[in-house]
Amino acid sequence: MSMGRKIIAVDFDGTLCINQDVVNWPYLGQPNKELVEKLKALQDEGHVLILWTCREGELLEQAVAWCRNFCGINFDAVNDNIEATKTFFGGNSRKISCDYYIDDKGCTPDVFYKLLL
């Protein structure tokens, strides 16, 4: 894949970590193997990965360790912009700045409009 270096933000629950249910949250389910393999390949090609999740504190630490130990993914940033982005914009916004957001809850405006019909 030749697309220049991209920054990819990926959600944890329901995206990287699947087979969970609300009743058992914050249970750590199984890895989304296809996504994990694709992300690892992209990182090997030089792309930047950011873990982008609502988890915080100990639950966030568990998720980061799960990704590292169980999936072999070491994120370039966790719930934060990378240093190059902070430098470029002269600060750090609350919104993660990236080229792609991967999230089980997301949708494009076109999909959202169709949901309203």
Describe the residue ranges of each PLM region:
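HAD-like aspartate-dependent phosphatase fold
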Residues: 1-117
